[in-house]
Amino acid sequence: MEKANETSPVMGFVLLRLSAHPELEKTFFVLILLMYLVILLGNGVLILVTILDSRLHTPMYFFLGNLSFLDICFTTSSVPLVLDSFLTPQETISFSACAVQMALSFAMAGTECLLLSMMAFDRYVAICNPLRYSVIMSKAAYMPMAASSWAIGGAASVVHTSLAIQLPFCGDNVINHFTCEILAVLKLACADISINVISMEVTNVIFLGVPVLFISFSYVFIITTILRIPSAEGRKKVFSTCSAHLTVVIVFYGTLFFMYGKPKSKDSMGADKEDLSDKLIPLFYGVVTPMLNPIIYSLRNKDVKAAVRRLLRPKGFTQ
């Protein structure tokens, strides 16, 4: 295991991966490669149909196209490096490349948190205030909503990455992770990281707490409105328009809260299990969730399935 001199600055990092579990690495390589291909194909198809099919030129599918593009960017910022790490005995990464990866991953994660809350608002207006939907969710409204999600996520990423790269790293240069995950990198700093911790807590409130509360309140009103519909068929039809989004929210935020909110183990055996889970949970969040998103939206949405069929038919969008 490489260590930098205790007084010399770290010029690069070593990614530790699953070195304690070498028997799993080939299996994980194949699984992650297959999932990455599904992510590219599934999200790529969703982006195509939301652009090419005029029937899907609505706020909901505009947000969905943004989410699909974001998932491709998010996984591409880390998965190729993860795959490469399985093929090399010891994966090293330069300080600057690590900073770029931290920035991209953080920006994509923050943007997705806000995008999901914007999508919840879209569903709230569509179900609870349908007569004013076209006025409230006009193009002049939903495009700035999406743009602000990207801008705020990017700004937060710049702040956190800037704070992280200004820290001195003069000791252990081994990142106990697949990628340059910001929390794993901060553990290697040989200086006080109080500012980083405080800023991270503030960010957690902005990107986790506030969106979850907003989404929760939106769905309280949505479910209340659905329950007032007299027919069971009517309730089922209306709920189907937001069930895919609700499923994605539960998977996405459930993984995030488990990753950042779970208690830490104190005994050595528990620490070993925690060490493995600290790698597998972000892997699930960074690969499995983006893979599930297009599957969930295509299985739960008749419009998307019909658009995909039209895409596969010659001249399907010309009719």
Curated annotation (Swiss-Prot):
It is a multi-pass membrane protein. Residues 51-58, 122-140, 221-237, 300-319 are cytoplasmic. One of its GO terms (biological process) is sensory perception of smell. GO terms for molecular function: G protein-coupled receptor activity; olfactory receptor activity. Keywords: Cell membrane, Disulfide bond, G-protein coupled receptor, Glycoprotein, Membrane, Olfaction, Receptor, Sensory transduction, Transducer, Transmembrane, Transmembrane helix. It holds the Pfam family 7tm_4. It is found in: Cell membrane. Disulfide bonds join 98-190. Residues 1-26, 81-101, 160-196, 261-279 are extracellular. Glycans are attached at residue 5. GO terms for cellular component: membrane; plasma membrane. The chain crosses the membrane at residues 27-50, 59-80, 102-121, 141-159, 197-220, 238-260, 280-299. The keyword Iron-sulfur does not apply. Belongs to the G-protein coupled receptor 1 family. PANTHER family: OLFACTORY RECEPTOR (PTHR26453). Odorant receptor. This is Olfactory receptor 2S2. The gene is OR2S2.
